[in-house]
Design a protein with these regions (language model features):
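Short secondary-structure boundary/hinge segments and terminal tails
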Residues: 19, 53-55, 186, 226-227
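Short acidic-hydrophobic catalytic motif
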Residues: 58
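Extracellular glycoside hydrolase catalytic/binding regions
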Residues: 63-69, 73-90, 94-252
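Extracellular cell-wall/glycan-interacting regions and their flexible linkers
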Residues: 1, 250-255
Length: 255
């Protein structure tokens, strides 16, 4: 990623894997953060829940007994204490909230932000949005924003009204896109909602992000996860991967 010109990676932490590995923090996160820091790059630690943190509902929720909100608080207490003096770490508190009202999500987000700050961590916190991290309308509930906090958005080709959803907020709030991408016609995908092209989706969306100075993380630097940037290993890029490399190369040249 960094050789391609990027300056940040997003590391998803699966709650079930974390639950069953007492050394997860040291075995994985510490090593990634150290490696990135040695090259002056950032790591976004993404707590990878997708669903309702209050009642645990959602088709993609992990098979563990803990209440998601309580377990999220436990994770962030431990993680914030561990990395509070590590400046290249960014905390993304919850991947994709689903099935809850704006006010309910605001209460959940406020509680997790408080846990992180109470642990002494002052780094940037990224807060997602309801409806699979797409509906920024909940920001109307905010009032005064927390210090050093940004708000994330996930956009794929099926979200055809993304500009309408973003336009009312990009000039008023610090927005960062922590997932976006598409699967071109050179790859087969299980999720047809990811199908898109450079011209119809990629150029339009990336140009909008550049115009409004919005940071982004492309998904996924992998050949298994969809939409993948690589084909059957890490040697040959998909059309999507080539487009990301072009975007990052352009940024590198401009700097």
């Amino acid at each position: 990623v960094f050789d391609m010109g990027g300056n940040a990676i997003r590391v998803p932490v699966d709650p079930a894997e974390y639950k069953h590995d007492d050394y997860y923090m040291w075995r994985y996160l510490d090593r990634v953060v150290t490696w990135a820091g040695e090259h002056d790059n950032y790591v976004i630690i993404d707590w990878d829940y997708t669903g309702n943190p209050i009642d645990g509902s959602g088709d993609e929720m992990p098979d563990i007994d803990d209440n998601p909100l309580d377990y999220s608080a436990e994770f962030w207490k431990n993680t914030a204490e561990y990395f509070k003096n590590t400046p290249n770490v960014i905390f993304e508190i919850y991947n994709e909230p689903v099935g809850m009202s704006d006010s309910e999500w605001k209460r959940c987000a406020d509680s997790l932000i408080s846990v992180i700050r109470s642990a002494g961590a002052k780094q940037l916190i990224i807060v997602g949005s309801p409806d699979y991290c797409y509906d920024l309308g909940w920001l109307d509930e905010l009032g005064e924003t927390n210090s050093n906090t940004a708000f994330s958005l996930h956009v794929y080709p099926d979200k055809v009204f993304w500009q309408k959803f973003m336009s009312g907020y990009v000039t008023s709030y610090p927005i960062v896109v922590t997932e976006w991408g598409y699967a071109d016609d050179d790859v087969e995908v299980k999720n047809e909602k990811l199908k898109g092209t450079r011209n119809v989706f990629g150029i339009k969306f990336s140009s909008y992000l550049e115009k409004h100075d919005i940071g982004w993380i492309a998904s996924s630097y992998d050949y298994k996860s969809e939409p993948a940037m690589f084909k059957n290993g890490y040697k040959n890029k998909t059309k999507w991967g080539e487009f990301v490399a072009d975007l990052l190369g352009e940024k590198e040249e401009e700097q």
